[in-house]
Amino acid sequence: MRILGLILAGGHSSRMGQDKASLKFGRKTLAENQREILVKHHFPVAISSNTSAKTDIAIPVLPDPAEVKYAGPLAGIYAGLQYASTNNYQFVLTMPVDCPIIPDEFFVKMTSAIDTTTCLRIASTPSGLQPTFALWATKLKSDLFNFLIGSENKSIRSFAFAHNVSIVRFDNVYSEGAFFNVNTPEDYQYLQENFRIKDEKQS
């Protein structure tokens, strides 16, 4: 089974006040950090983005398709499923650009024992579901398009729970800083002050 790694970076970063993908984490930007993590785990990589600012990291940049543009993370995921379908990937593994500390266990558990019956897996931590950390079967592309066109509630959760989602639990890693989400300048400062060493470990 071929799996595409997709970095979700299509948001407006409104709470941060600047493009989160370009923020530095150690020696790298957050986008570069996510790319390197995926490459380390042997995944081909693309990035969902509606600006050209991420093109300097030398991976395919997938803007939201016009018919679903700015429909939230699902629009970026749909772009990834389109790309995966065209390029013969059976699955898309998504991760947000603003969560730079990802345990190796994530990649193992999310992609283990997949087959043609696997539909959608979403990660869960002690703080709850992490909908942007997910494994999507490429065959969901048409269903997702119809959902985006026809549904007012365009949340990942709404789509997932109508499509045989499996929840993959990560209960023992959150205290290590895994899945920490950078939404605000305060979050970014906390990341830099408390988890900078993680950047060195993942290099």
Outline where the language-model segments fall.
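Nucleotide and nucleotide-moiety/phosphate-recognizing core
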Residues: 1-153, 161-176, 185, 192-199
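PAPS-dependent sulfotransferase catalytic core
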Residues: 181
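Flexible, D/E/H-enriched segments
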Residues: 156
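Cationic, low-complexity basic patches in intrinsically disordered or flexible, solvent-exposed regions
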Residues: 202-203
